[in-house]
Amino acid sequence: MKNGLSEILEEEIVGIHDAARPFVSKEVIGRCYREALNFRCGIIPVIEERNSVRILTAYENKAFDRERIRVVQTPQVFPAGLLKNAYETPYREEFTDDASVAEDDGIQIKLVEGDEKNIKITTPLDLRFAEFLYRDNLI
């Protein structure tokens, strides 16, 4: 990431996209870039969680209000200068994506509407679902 960012001017807007999400729409990309330009902060697309969720601790598990959960997608979009500074932070296991690195550096993260079809293909079942979406022109 640092090598790529070193080639980008500080005032540019940069998007980081997960190659495992091949169905990202022009609308989501445009929405993320517009918001990053307008607000000069980190922008990430999200969708609502529809499943019931539980929080686990070492001692118990409890139901958690899914209305407070959002599922993060890509692209994650930032002013390049902010992201360059954030990536000077030494790596930690808590960093799960670019937004978590940026947030740790004090960068505000704004959520925008994602797209359910912007699926992440990480398992054989995901791949079969993606093939179905593509074959039946549902994307």
Predicted regions located by residue number:
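Active-site nucleotide-sugar/metal-binding loop of Leloir-type enzymes
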Residues: 2-13
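Short beta-strand-to-loop acidic/aromatic patch adjacent to the donor-nucleotide binding site
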Residues: 11-21
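Conserved core of the sugar-phosphate nucleotidyltransferase
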Residues: 23-112, 139
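Hydrophobic helical membrane-anchoring modules
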Residues: 118-139
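Residue-level signal for inorganic ion chemistry
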Residues: 4, 17-18, 48, 79, ...
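Conserved strand-to-helix beginnings and helix N-cap segments that scaffold or border functional pockets
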Residues: 1-2, 26-30, 124
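A short, conserved beta-strand element in the Rossmann-like catalytic core
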Residues: 20-23, 118
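Conserved Class I S-adenosyl-L-methionine
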Residues: 110, 114, 118-120
